[in-house]
């Protein structure tokens, strides 16, 4: 690590609880956020939820709106000198109902008590490690980059970039190098489940074998096999015997040991896909203009509880008074983090809609090429932030409900020098096949030529790849003989 401001800065660096909370809230789905809000409501008497009232005066409505909107300007590091008058302590806290307790959610009780996710499980272990603040920040970014199978979905350079971005947010001029990330990654890979954070199946299996006791039978032979991973997956036993010097019996025993490992260590944390999703953002068309808004049904209206805040005595240093002051700071931090989450979500969703208006007008064929970097640069956020805010967040459109990540697709060149979206090309292939003569189905080469006539230059093998991803059989299998 290169320090331009000295070792003292690195030693004093701390990943503030507020920043940790803001990062975590960004990646929560709407249901997970609802659960988190309820946990905060149950544990902090200074935080309360504004309940909807059927008959409210305009003055009351305006006051409630101001209380939520002003949360962005709350200074979490300072309490006003003049607080309301002192009041007797009352430890009774009335539980506020949540959207999850409405009748329409009664059948979804399991969602409120689901097992910890993979990332939550890993963060719990990371917080127990004696990492330096910078290493802990690196670990958070590594965990954030895990996919559902437990593999590291980002390369080391991307992790470094994410860490640098967060350090800059905290105004620290510290340069993190790839070697440091690799060291932290090795620690992560040896947490439970072992092999988590691997960059390939070979590395995943290697970490698990290496973690076994040295007295484990055939451990040494299994490690030898993994050094010839390509021969192993191709099941070329003769070459394996020649390369490793193992006889057939030892080879079989080593392979049997490898079969006891977990190829996808994060799979046990995968949650079954729900048959419903709640939209986070909605888009609608009015007077030839598209409007984006957050789903009002899931927007939490939070505020500071005036009753308990009125008990805080400015000059009182008692434990009870200090407890209330701390709880007020935590409540303000939480309100601000939730508010920032929604502002970021709306900003990113609006940018995506701006790029994909043609999709809204004509469907998948109108999808434009768009990648995380495009949106990140436009809204002036880091790619990792855009990734967090588009994962498990859903946009309700006139054409259906879509995860925000659905609107990202790779670029494919066109004959005119422009670019087309891979999603749009898949849609065109699907339409061509749907309209083909079943007695003379279109070959991949014919489809490629038809796309070229539309200005989309794709190879036959690319068409085959897209066709297979759509689960469309080959032309010979589609042919109908009558």
UniProtKB/Swiss-Prot annotation:
Keywords: DNA-binding, DNA-directed RNA polymerase, Nucleotidyltransferase, Sigma factor, Transcription, Transcription regulation, Transferase
Annotation: DNA-binding region: 371-390
Biased composition (Basic and acidic residues): 55-65
GO cellular component terms listed in the entry, alphabetical order: DNA-directed RNA polymerase complex
Disordered, as annotated region: 50-69
Lineage: superkingdom: Bacteria
Residue ranges of the motif RPON box: 459-467
Keyword Transport included in the entry's annotation: no
Keyword Transcription regulation on entry: yes
GO molecular function: DNA binding; DNA-binding transcription activator activity; nucleotidyltransferase activity; sigma factor activity
A Pfam match: Sigma54_CBD
GO terms, biological process: DNA-templated transcription initiation
InterPro entries: RNA_pol_sigma_54, RNA_pol_sigma_54_core-bd, RNA_pol_sigma_54_DNA-bd, RpoN_core-bd_sf
Family to which the UniProt record says this protein belongs: Belongs to the sigma-54 factor family.
NCBIfam families, alphabetized: PRK05932.1-2 (NF004595), PRK12469.1 (NF009118), rpoN_sigma (TIGR02395)
Function of the molecule: Sigma factors are initiation factors that promote the attachment of RNA polymerase to specific initiation sites and are then released.
Protein's name in the database: RNA polymerase sigma-54 factor
Organism: Acinetobacter guillouiae
């Amino acid at each position: 690590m290169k320090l331009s401001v000295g070792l003292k800065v690195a030693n004093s660096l701390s990943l503030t609880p507020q920043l940790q909370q803001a990062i975590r809230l960004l990646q929560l789905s709407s249901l997970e956020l609802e659960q988190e809000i309820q946990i905060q409501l149950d544990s902090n008497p200074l935080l309360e939820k504004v309940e909807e009232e059927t008959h409210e005066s305009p003055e009351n409505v305006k006051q409630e709106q101001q209380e939520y909107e002003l949360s962005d300007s709350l200074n979490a590091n300072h309490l006003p000198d003049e607080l309301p008058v002192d009041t007797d302590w009352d430890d009774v806290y009335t539980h506020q109902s949540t959207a999850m307790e409405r009748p329409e959610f009664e059948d979804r009780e399991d969602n409120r008590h689901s097992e910890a996710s993979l990332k939550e499980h890993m963060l719990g272990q990371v917080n127990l490690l004696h990492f330096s603040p910078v290493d802990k920040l690196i670990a958070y970014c590594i965990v954030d980059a895990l996919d559902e199978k437990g593999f590291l979905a980002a390369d080391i350079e991307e992790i470094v970039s994410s860490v640098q971005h967060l350090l800059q947010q905290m105004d620290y001029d510290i340069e993190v190098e790839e070697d440091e990330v690799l060291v932290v990654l090795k620690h992560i890979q040896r947490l439970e489940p072992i092999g988590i954070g691997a960059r390939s199946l070979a590395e995943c299996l290697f970490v698990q074998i290496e973690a076994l006791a040295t007295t484990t039978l055939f451990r040494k032979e299994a490690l030898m096999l993994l050094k010839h991973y390509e021969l192993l997956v191709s099941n070329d036993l003769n070459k394996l015997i020649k390369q490793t010097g193992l006889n057939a019996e030892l080879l079989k025993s080593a392979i049997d040991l490898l079969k006891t490992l977990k190829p996808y260590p994060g799979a046990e944390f995968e949650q079954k896909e729900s048959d419903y999703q709640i939209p986070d953002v909605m888009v609608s068309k009015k007077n030839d203009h598209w409007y984006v808004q957050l789903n009002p049904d899931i927007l939490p209206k939070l505020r500071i509880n005036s009753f308990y805040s009125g008990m805080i005595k400015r000059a009182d240093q008692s434990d009870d008074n200090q407890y209330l002051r701390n709880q007020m700071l935590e409540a303000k931090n939480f309100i601000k983090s939730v508010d920032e989450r929604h502002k970021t979500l709306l900003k990113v969703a609006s940018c995506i809609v701006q790029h994909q208006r043609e999709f809204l007008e004509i469907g998948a064929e109108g999808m434009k090429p768009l990648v995380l970097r495009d949106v990140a640069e436009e809204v002036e956020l880091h790619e990792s932030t855009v990734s967090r805010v588009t994962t498990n967040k859903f946009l309700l459109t006139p054409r259906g409900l879509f995860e925000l990540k659905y609107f990202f697709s790779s670029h494919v060149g066109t004959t005119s020098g422009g670019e087309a979206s891979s999603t749009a090309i898949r849609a065109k292939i699907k339409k061509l096949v749907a309209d083909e003569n079943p007695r003379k189905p279109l070959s991949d080469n014919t489809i490629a030529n038809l796309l070229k006539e539309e200005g989309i230059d794709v190879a036959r093998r690319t068409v085959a790849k897209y066709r297979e991803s759509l689960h469309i059989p080959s032309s010979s299998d589609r042919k109908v003989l009558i």
